[in-house]
């Protein structure tokens, strides 16, 4: 009997500082423990901590392949069982076809990213990936105003561009009541 490869798409989403990258790294390390071939990618625009590593806010890290175009993943994925993609919201809509093709080829694809921008508008690529995913994990953070569960990323600067790569100087997590779009 022929062995059927069962690919999947998993999405880890939530606001800034909710542990998305931490969870992605955890799942990939578990894959390594299970003797799976694992690779992680990030958009080259994300150079906050390192060009060569995906790094969580807690400084946990895993070696990665920075790419400018999501289609570059195909160049590295032939012998990979589990593919991680961090900060997925930085990629254009072609990431959807890339993830679907990889999953259809039997790969386990785990993406992590913000589901909404600083105005609470969904990132289009993430919205589509959420619709295509077999497994969704929505994380929360802690509201920096009241201490409640936070699902929003509050921008602290006047910059109006949708994508602003930043940290706690530019963003903080907020609950619905304390969020000011």
Predicted regions, residues:
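Conserved P-loop
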Residues: 1-77, 117-128, 138-141, 165-180
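A short acidic, amphipathic alpha-helical/loop segment
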Residues: 27, 93-101, 125
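Walker B beta-strand of ABC/ABC-like P-loop ATPase nucleotide-binding domains
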Residues: 83-84
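Walker B catalytic acidic pair
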Residues: 87-88, 113
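Catalytic P-loop NTPase motifs of RecA-like helicase/translocase cores
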Residues: 90-92, 118
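Sensor-1/coupling segment of RecA-like P-loop NTPase cores
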Residues: 102-124
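Short basic (Lys/Arg) and small-residue
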Residues: 133
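Short recognition patches in nucleic-acid-associated and regulatory proteins
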Residues: 142-164
